[in-house]
Amino acid sequence: MLHVLWTFWILVAMTDLSRKGCSAQASLSCDAAGVCDGRSRSFTSIPSGLTAAMKSLDLSNNKITSIGHGDLRGCVNLRALILQSSGINTIEEDAFSSLSKLEYLDLSDNHLSNLSSSWFRPLSSLKYLNLLGNPYRILGETPLFLNLTHLQTLRVGNVATFSGIRRTDFAGLTSLDELEIKALSLQNYEPGSLQSIQSIHHLTFHLSQSDFLLGVFEDTLSSVGYLELRDANLDSFYFSELSTDEMNSPMKKLAFQNADLTDESFNELLKLLRYTPELLEVEFDDCTLNGVGDFQPSESDVVRELGKVETLIIRRLHIPRFYSFYDLSTVYTLLEKVKRITVENSKVFLVPCLFSQHLKSLEFLDLSENLMVEEYLKNAACEGSWPSLQTLILRQNRLKSIERTGKILLTLKNLTALDISRNSFQSMPDSCQWPGKMRFLNLSSTGIQAVKMCIPQTLEVLDVSNNNLISFSLFLPLLRELYISRNKLHTLPDASLFPVLLVMKIRENAISTFSKDQLSSFPKLVSLEAGGNHFICSCELLSFTLEHPALVQVLAGWPDSYLCDSPSRLRGQRVQDARPSVLECHQTLLVSGVCCALVLLILLIGGLCHHFHGLWYLRMMWAWLQAKRKPKKAPCRDICYDAFVSYSEQDSYWVENLMVQQLENSEPPFKLCLHKRDFVPGKWIIDNIIDSIEKSHKTLFVLSENFVRSEWCKYELDFSHFRLFDENNDAGILVLLEPIEKKAIPQRFCKLRKIMNTKTYLEWPLDEGQQEVFWVNLRTAIKS
């Protein structure tokens, strides 16, 4: 037993710690303006540490069961407090005592079963109060709202338990913009309960029992401008005379939402209208008519009193026995002066011709989302029907032919605006007939693929949005507004087609760019909405947006709706913020710069080659490649000469008459290779030089000023230099025929200059006594 108790205690402790941990982790998020968000944070109590800096506090969707007297003490500057769906069942008497500046309080959908006037006594600045969805039966034991003199919006009641409304419940309230009372379980309504409120702009009353309708209606006749009755079952409603003689009601609009009616109860409701001489609009939303349209208003004065009603709106009317529905002939006279009729999404497929002819004052007719086809439309638009009609809306019906629809409507002489959008036309003929005064035409979402001359030339507003158009080339001289969004256009239409165009909406097409010329070609354009297209953020587009801010001001939605689609690195960025690379924006300048740089580089390389003998190195490379095809060292049988003699033609006398005689006639004789004598006729001279040097044991250079200036001597010196460099030997012999400076030998012949710097060279003596020694030394050098 002790073990069980111990285990239970541990579980309880862990649960408690878990709750505390969750509470500790939850926190408010507040911005600099003092707006604090604590929605859905699993708070079990009002968070601590609330300060005077808070202006708005939202703690909806939490688990706060109670509000203590000190929980909100620090919020002295709070303007809005939202506690919707927070599980609150208890509020202490002075919980709101510090909230004198509070203007907005939402306590809806909690568990408050008893309301206390002390909660609201300090809230002298309150403008909005929502008490819907709490399980109270009545609005407190004492009047709740005596001190709420600034209250503008009040919502009270619930679905299940709110059962009584008393005369004192709304005491202290003199004027409200909006009052909503949800009393679907109402069992008691004291007459005069709403009379204390002198003015209510909009009263919404959820009332399921029709027994209290007359009492509510009578109490609000002198104060309510717009009465909306919701969720009412009026099948058994019966009108009995009102006790009031009030005939100057300010009521302008009467609406029924989610109400059930019968033919008989509709007749009874008409009797209420004699008390609302200023009534202009009657509306039925989501109602059910449990009848067949056999309306038989019995009093002639009803017809007279209905004369000021200008607007009748019927939306989503459900008629279970619509197949037995009458032709409405009994109410023709009721609607003769009505100017605006909307019958939307109510399965209307036919309007009798006679009914249309009785609607002599009708200027606006909306039959959207019904079942009209051309055949029955022709019956509705018969000759003499709707003589004053200016606007006709047939959106989302079953129309198939634009041509036939236009022809049917020729009977409507005053028609200026036609909406036939969301019908399945698919195609457009080349020509059509339309009423002569047409100014507005809506063909959006009809599947058309091209715009042709079928469109009337009198149009000032045209909507062809959400179709399959790839171009627009129709001339419309009077067009002021063009709506062509969600198509497949790749460019703006030609401005010459619309000389007076003011507004164009061309969102979500395939437009990639536009230019100054395009926009400036629309002389009167004040608004162009082109966001949502696939813009290529090219340099031209960006330059246009930066350089022409006045034209950019025409772009509606700029800059947030204009995003780059390409290049990929800019995708998703605003066009205004995109920054392409220099390469993309200055290609011509960049190419010119590169070309100039290349020319300068070539000139620089040429200058360096000239200065550092680059051509010589190229020739050496060529010679090296040629020499590489041959063995580095020729076999002994290939050595044909003891020495190859390189000399200038100006020194030929000394070479041929002195040196050749001394060397070739000596014992043993030397075999010399001379270019005059031994070069192979017809062979390329450079090949002769290379072969002669390679077939010679030594290369003998007769250096003189003439040698340095000789071009062919330089070639021979070049290839000899290559051999010295490549084979790393001492095959070169220098003979100075006359004194010459070492620097006269080009710097590039580093090997030969090294020889002159490190080895003794032979110098031809002018003294005849020393010349014999010279020949001996020369023979020795050749033999080595």
Swiss-Prot record:
Broad class of where this protein is predominantly found: membrane
Site description Interaction with bacterial lipopeptide, residues in chain: 349
The gene coding this protein: TLR2
Membrane topology: Single-pass type I membrane protein
Transmembrane residue ranges: 589-609
One MF annotation (Gene Ontology) recorded for this entry: triacyl lipopeptide binding
Chain positions of motif ATG16L1-binding motif: 761-778
Name this protein carries in UniProt: Toll-like receptor 2
GO BP field: cellular response to diacyl bacterial lipopeptide; cellular response to triacyl bacterial lipopeptide; inflammatory response; innate immune response; positive regulation of cytokine production; regulation of tumor necrosis factor production; toll-like receptor signaling pathway
Residue span, TIR domain: 639-782
A GO term from the CC aspect: Golgi apparatus
